[in-house]
């Protein structure tokens, strides 16, 4: 095995940071659901990959650039996510924490099989229409599609941060997360807010999946990888923290790209999850969490 030179390491680091922002956007939905609704959402991976597949479907129907179609796919996933939380997850929550977990697992199996039935198991990728267009900055080659995806991811993360921290909706959501019973007594529509939050989470996850689908190929089983990387990003950044999720995504992307530079693409996910497990042992509360 030959070690990469300094230029290759710099190229890998920049690529990792760009991809990490898209990882963060895809994982942000999981962070919102776990941090606010307090549900471990095993359907998250399917929501991410569904964003890529719906964009693929819309691309085949319209021929438009997938960068324009990705927000529409995200809205469709958000619209599908709202009734799932409102009419499937909320009724079973009173039976304990395990039942919503099992419900999302069952839904993930159903959705993955529907994707196999509808699209087959063949590998697909979204053609951004940008081809091999790149920017050359200081000797580093930056694919245009990755740069645009990163800009979109950062802007959406910033918008969600403002929504959660600076608006009346965000204050109500935070109140419902801290003490749902007290918030309901004060007139906060907790159930509706949880459903809207789950829809928002599904939408941003799907948008992240569509952006990643322009960089990586995907199949219905890619949902498992997205779920694992989502948990890694959320634990790294801390539950419910938008800034933490973004930094966690950047860190994970950096580890994946550098491991690919050293060991090859086949070890990308393995090395990232190994680093995640080591971090989990050393700092289980995440970068921005506090010890209980």
What are the functions of these language-model segments?
Residues 1-25, 54, 65-69, 95-102, ...:
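Membrane-interfacial amphipathic/re-entrant helices at transmembrane-helix boundaries
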Residues 1-9, 86-94, 284-292:
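Transmembrane alpha-helical segments of polytopic membrane transport and secretion proteins
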Residues 4-16, 142, 164, 168, ...:
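Inter-helical junctions in multi-pass inner-membrane proteins, predominant
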Residues 8, 118, 178-185, 189-192, ...:
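Cytosolic-side transmembrane-helix boundaries in multi-pass membrane proteins
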Residues 8-60, 83, 87-99, 236-243:
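Single transmembrane alpha-helix segments in multi-pass membrane proteins
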Residues 19, 141-219, 242-248:
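Helix-loop-helix "hairpin" substructures at the membrane interface of multi-pass membrane proteins
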Residues 30, 63-107, 114, 247-252, ...:
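Alpha-helical transmembrane segments within multi-pass membrane transporters and channels
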Residues 91-166, 193-196, 258, 263, ...:
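Transmembrane helix-bundle core of multi-pass membrane transporters
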